[in-house]
Amino acid sequence: IGRALLSEPRLLLMDEPLAALDAARKSEIMGHIERLRDVLGVPIVYVSHALEEVTRLADHMVLLADGGVVATGSAVDIMSRPDLSPHTGRHKAGALIETQVAGHDDFGLTELAFTGGVLRVAGLDLAAGTAVRARIRARDVAIATTRPSDLSILNVFPGRIAEMHPSGAAAMDLQLDIGVKLWARITARSAHELGLVPGREVFALVKSVAIDRHSLGLAQPPNRN
């Protein structure tokens, strides 16, 4: 990367640059790539099979399969489409949420403000106002039909079921409107027993510890071309 930058490129092509690295080194290098993206302003074409890398670094995605383009659009939109989960990974399906650091509490948590409220995650060494993109996996979201009390889960967001889609033989994917799009994956039995239907108001529950550092990345500055 250093040698490439010395030539003052107009565009950088990174083809699986982190494939041979362990998780700790990947996270470190991704931080450097984020800073390159934001400080130098050089467009980067980033090729990878690792969804966590792409969702952390990219603002625009082109999804390829069998030699052709399956979908193209913003990373937020692509990750919000359940029909693409066979390509993006059913186990990793979820939503991307653009947030800003609102502050830090006395218990080692960072508060990330977004349209739907405040998302509390494990502490980040970032200043207030820093833009952060959070990836919330559908399997990490639970549903309640009434606001819960005496609960260890800190992230509780009121919202409405926008869509419901069967996912495999026993699961149901719910698209929730909590001010932004959020996905929840629950069992079809739970959906039936709770009487869930599109339009119903519910509460989305997200454990803070389910959102690890690999699910968070510095968002691209909004005014870049």
Regions picked out by a protein language model, each given a short descriptive name:
Residues 8:
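Conserved catalytic motifs of ABC-family nucleotide-binding domains
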Residues 116-165, 183-225:
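Glycine/charge-rich catalytic "coupling/switch" loops of P-loop NTPases
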Residues 26-40:
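Helical segment within the ABC ATPase nucleotide-binding domain
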Residues 1:
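Hydrophobic anchor residue at the start of the ABC signature
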Residues 20-21, 36:
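Short coil-to-helix N-cap segments within the nucleotide-binding domains
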Residues 12-16:
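Catalytic Walker B motif of ABC-type/P-loop ATPase nucleotide-binding domains
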Residues 34, 38, 48-117:
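Internal alpha/beta loop-helix hairpins
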